[in-house]
């Protein structure tokens, strides 16, 4: 199979999986990204031109705001990918886990730590020019999924992600990077629409950020989970099975 056909096949599977699982993924995304949307809205209200400080301090404030906005746009994606991994890989004979069951299985501390460190290394990569941020973004994109799928430690998740991506860097990059860019573009469009309908206050920004992330984050997370499973299978010959469609709810038989 050529690289192009393999890549197109991955995108087709992402689309099919997203459509099949949207009824359960979108509420899960709402739980994660509505609170984070408020933080995004606050950070996007920063206006360095209004600060009564010297140009040096204004530049520092601008750089700080840039880092904060970059971090806020990425934070939550790794955590959400871990939650999606639980939902998409439950045993075939079992019903899909409920929100409460997913909440009970999530490794909160490890995923939050992985999420924070992932954002940190990308922010550090910004100071090493964009190439550094791009490399870190791709090599560690699978960290959250492997932490949940294989119960790694925080550092073990980063190491495992690097191992899986190594040798497949451009394949992974060709999936996660365009999805991140397109997702950001859609998110910006939703925020703009929200401002045009609701004004320019923090409520409009919060609504736009939340809705944009709820719509786009599942695409990225589904892609991460599918790539993780594919690369596990390629490397070791086996991987957790992807549950392609939610099982229909079967009514209990009468006694």
Predicted regions and their residues:
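Interfacial aromatic "cap" segments that immediately flank transmembrane helices
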Residues: 2-35, 101-125, 136-188
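Solvent-exposed, acidic/flexible segments
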Residues: 4-8, 60-65, 73, 77, ...
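Membrane-helix interface segments in multi-pass membrane proteins
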Residues: 35-73, 98, 103-105, 126-133, ...
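A conserved helix-loop-strand patch within extracytoplasmic ligand-binding domains
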Residues: 62, 66, 70, 77, ...
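Short helix-coil transition sites and intra-membrane helix breaks within transmembrane domains
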Residues: 74, 130, 147-151
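Juxtamembrane transition segments at transmembrane-helix termini in multipass membrane proteins
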Residues: 1, 13, 49-53, 80-95, ...
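Hydrophobic alpha-helical segments of integral membrane proteins
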Residues: 33, 39-41, 86, 234
């Amino acid at each position: 199979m050529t690289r192009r056909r393999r890549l197109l096949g991955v995108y087709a599977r992402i689309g099919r999986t997203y459509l099949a699982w949207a009824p359960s993924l979108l509420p899960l995304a709402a739980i994660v990204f509505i609170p984070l949307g408020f933080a995004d809205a606050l950070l996007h209200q920063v206006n360095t031109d209004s600060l009564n400080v010297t140009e040096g301090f204004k530049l520092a404030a601008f750089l700080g705001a840039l880092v904060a906005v970059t971090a806020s746009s990425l934070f939550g994606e790794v955590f959400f990918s871990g939650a999606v991994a639980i939902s998409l890989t439950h045993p075939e004979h079992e019903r899909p886990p409920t929100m409460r069951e997913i909440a009970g299985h999530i490794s909160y501390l490890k995923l939050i730590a992985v999420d924070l460190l992932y954002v940190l290394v990308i922010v550090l990569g910004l100071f090493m020019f964009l190439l550094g941020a791009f490399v870190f973004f791709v090599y560690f994109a699978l960290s959250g999924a492997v932490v949940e799928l294989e119960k790694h430690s925080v550092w073990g998740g980063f190491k495992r992600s690097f191992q899986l991506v190594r040798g497949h860097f451009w394949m992974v990059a060709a999936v996660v990077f365009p999805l991140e860019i397109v997702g950001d573009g859609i998110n910006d469009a939703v925020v703009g629409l929200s401002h045009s309908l609701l004004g320019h206050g923090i409520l409009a920004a919060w609504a736009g950020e939340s809705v944009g992330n709820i719509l786009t984050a599942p695409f990225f997370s589904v892609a991460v989970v599918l790539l993780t499973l594919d690369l596990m299978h390629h490397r070791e010959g086996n991987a957790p099975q992807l549950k392609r469609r939610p099982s229909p709810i079967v009514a209990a038989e009468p006694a």
